[in-house]
């Protein structure tokens, strides 16, 4: 006997969270809970404003239609990426095919005063990998901050993300302030320039490795080995079903590229599932999941070690 519930939720964000020039005051999304006999599976559907093609309202409409079809015996996945991902996670939990083991190590997202960051990162246990957003300020300032961190902590490796913010000139201004002796400790820089060709040229000219992120979701993208390209950053909420995520990871690994499972600012429930996916598909790579502290609460499932209050399922709005 099948049953299901869909929950709608909204989490207040910390002040200062800006995505593509818009302030994100709340994170809005949906959960689907599928039950069959004694088994249960959960999934999160939370399109990311400014990044997802679909809106939250569109996702809700597609999800509710899919749930009704599933209750009637139809299991075909929807095409909408955020819904396909959430539904496939719920089905995988229901079938016990999403392993429980999780990689809760997250490359910390570095914001704020560089001196404070140096103290925080120096005390980091084990492999020191951190993420810095660049492209929000002047390229020269970004270069100076990155250089300062790499100089102060000799065993630190940085993942940088420019979100296609730079012109070729700004990319060169950034690189000018990063000591060539430190550049090999930039694990990769995600999408430095507005076009892929400009990003490739940046990698060739600076010796700084790049990673594809937004490019993965463009229709003309193909997985090929390229000089200067070291990694792909896979955001499942923006990608689609678990099968599609796994195909992309396998395609990257076949080329010798690092594949990084990364957050689209999901709630704690979604983040714990991403940690499980990372342990399953990319066991040797620290995922990019350090986004929970951008929110003011956890929901349904806790992230280990987080002190944020937990909102129980009973407090969520039911749609069925």
Swiss-Prot record:
Q: Name one GO biological process term.
A: menaquinone biosynthetic process
Q: Which Pfam families match?
A: MenC_N, MR_MLE_C
Residue positions annotated to bind Mg(2+) are 161, 190, 213
InterPro entries documented for this protein: Enolase-like_C_sf, Enolase-like_N, Enolase_C-like, Mandelate_racemase_C, OSB_synthase_MenC1, OSBS_N
Write down the superkingdom of origin.
Answer: Bacteria
Locate the active site: 133, 235
- Please provide, alphabetically and separated by semicolons, the GO molecular function terms listed in this UniProt record: magnesium ion binding; O-succinylbenzoate synthase activity
Q: Which reaction does it catalyse?
A: (1R,6R)-6-hydroxy-2-succinyl-cyclohexa-2,4-diene-1-carboxylate = 2-succinylbenzoate + H2O
Pathway noted in the entry: Quinol/quinone metabolism; 1,4-dihydroxy-2-naphthoate biosynthesis; 1,4-dihydroxy-2-naphthoate from chorismate: step 4/7; Quinol/quinone metabolism; menaquinone biosynthesis
Q: Which CDD domains match?
A: OSBS (cd03320)
Report the EC code(s) recorded for this entry: 4.2.1.113
Q: In which family does this protein belong, per the annotation?
A: Belongs to the mandelate racemase/muconate lactonizing enzyme family. MenC type 1 subfamily.
Q: What is this protein called?
A: o-succinylbenzoate synthase
């Amino acid at each position: 006997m099948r049953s299901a519930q869909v929950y709608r939720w909204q989490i207040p964000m910390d002040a200062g969270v800006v995505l593509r020039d818009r302030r994100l005051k709340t994170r809005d999304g949906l959960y689907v809970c599928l039950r069959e006999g004694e088994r249960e599976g959960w999934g999160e559907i939370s399109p990311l404003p400014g990044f997802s093609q679909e809106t939250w309202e569109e996702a809700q409409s597609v999800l509710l239609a899919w749930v009704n079809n599933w209750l009637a015996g139809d299991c075909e996945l929807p095409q909408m990426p955020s819904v396909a991902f959430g539904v496939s996670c719920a089905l995988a939990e229901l079938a016990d095919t999403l392993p429980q083991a999780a990689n809760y190590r997250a490359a910390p997202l570095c914001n704020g005063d560089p001196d404070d960051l140096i103290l925080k990162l120096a005390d980091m246990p084990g492999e020191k990998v951190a993420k810095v957003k660049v492209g929000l300020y002047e390229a020269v300032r970004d270069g100076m901050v990155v250089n300062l961190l790499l100089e102060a902590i000799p065993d630190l490796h940085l993942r940088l993300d420019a979100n296609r913010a730079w012109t070729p000139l700004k990319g060169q201004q950034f690189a000018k302030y990063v000591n060539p002796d430190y550049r090999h400790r930039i694990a990769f820089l995600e999408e430095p320039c507005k076009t892929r060709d400009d990003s490739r040229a940046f990698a060739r000219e600076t010796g700084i490795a790049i990673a594809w992120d937004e490019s993965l979701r463009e229709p003309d993208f193909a997985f090929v080995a390229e000089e200067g390209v070291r990694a792909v950053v896979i955001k499942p909420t923006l990608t689609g079903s678990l099968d599609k995520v796994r195909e992309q990871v396998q395609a990257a690994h076949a080329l010798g590229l690092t594949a990084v499972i990364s957050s689209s600012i999901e709630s704690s429930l979604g983040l714990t599932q991403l940690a499980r996916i990372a342990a399953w598909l990319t066991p040797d790579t620290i995922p990019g999941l350090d986004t929970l502290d951008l929110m003011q609460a956890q929901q349904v499932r806790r992230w280990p070690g987080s002190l944020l209050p937990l909102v129980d399922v009973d407090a969520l709005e039911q749609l069925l």
